Amino acid sequence: MNSEWQSLQPQTQQELKNTMNAMQPPQSIEEIKAGLETTEKGGVRQSIRNCLTVFQRDPLLSGAIAYNILTDRKDIIKPIGFHRESTALNDTDMKYLLLYLEETYGLTNEKKIDNAIGIVANENKYHPIRDYLSSLVWDGTERIRFCLRHFLGADADDYTYEALKLFLMGAISRAFQPGCKFEIMLCLVGGQGAGKSTFFRLLAVRDEWFSDDLRKLDDDNVYRKLQGHWIIEMSEMMATANAKSIEEIKSFLSRQKEVYKIPYETHPADRPRQCVFGGTSNALDFLPLDRSGNRRFIPVMVYPEQAEVHILEDEAASRAYIEQMWAEAMEIYRSGRFKLAFSPAMQRYLKEHQRDFMPEDTKAGMIQAYLDKYTGSMVCSKQLYKEALNHAFDEPKQWEIREINEIMNQCISGWRYFPNPRMFSEYGRQKGWERENPATDSGNPSEKTMDGFVEVTEQMELPF
């Protein structure tokens, strides 16, 4: 087996094998007719086998019908004698095919013809994005590192480079390995007219591989919104803004497949994701408030006044630049020297960087202000609810306690959680937090401290 064949991805090798198996040498119409099965009376048998023979060997139809792995549809990929607007097989195409098989071969059973089309398409699979990416030859000039600076004026630093490289690796991986784990959204943030949406559209290479039509994450037909697209833009983060909760957003981005039944099919099927998601926002505080971390969102600030060119100034040149950037990305992908995640150091930087893009956390601010003035060494959730959040006469609900716990554990530094309940004079036995460097207490441990709690000694523990 030669080196060119070995360099192909396994999926591409299998697709080529399927294509070669399906591509029987075309024969003349008379030769095909002579080889068709007949009935006892000498007529053409209306069988799937006969229909399949025609689709495989007819000089017009041989190699014409293929299954598009990206769109999950059947395509007609070569001229077959009538005008067509797109490659996807549609109802009008079927009428022409039925007419051709009836007039040329006497085959008239529509169901058997349709079954034969399904078989021949399945034996002749292709993936347009894989074919495109595999055809690229890199010229050796580095572009990923400078792309966002070139078109959008972003900082030309390691973070911007790693952010775009990670996104490109995710997109390539999803094309060659549908359903692979990739839950990252590259988010371009900056003023209107900077070219953010255009960047994602051109990044998709072909307009039909791009979509900005995703408005709701809980749409029952979300698979139809993703089907056939490679780069999905969430314009102004509308879909995440309309989400019911941060957990819904996390779940959607983490999903690796959709389970969906295409109309007129009998059974639902797993549809592994072949797309990645990019976000655009004019507003700075676009990130959803998530105290446990927004690691799925990678914001990059853009400054169009610093861009070397506007992306639409010369669209042909911009497309050529992006094509060579994909060629560079394919070199990285083929090398295998990449991960679909940030390094630990970059993750730490991202966590700090994201704070600039989150809405103000008013409750965390109130608790921090309270603790800055508080002179005691221990606090509990109930105390913070009543004293820091000003609910002196209310009892906290369970979700409010969980929210305070999350703030203390995720947003407040200098305090350490203790899991074993201790006695607070105002609030009873409670779990809570203690200062990491409390002042030395020289008093009797049974005496009330400045916090209003009594330290429980071993002798004071309840005997049950």
PLM features per residue range, with description:
Residues L60, A66-I69, D75-I76, G81, ...:
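Residue-level preference for alpha-helix termini and adjacent loops
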Residues E102-H127, K181, E208-D212, D218-L253, ...:
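Feature primarily recognizes SF3-like P-loop helicase cores of small DNA viruses
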Residues M1-R143, D158, E162, D394-E395, ...:
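N-terminal nucleic-acid engagement/recognition segments and initiation subdomains in replication
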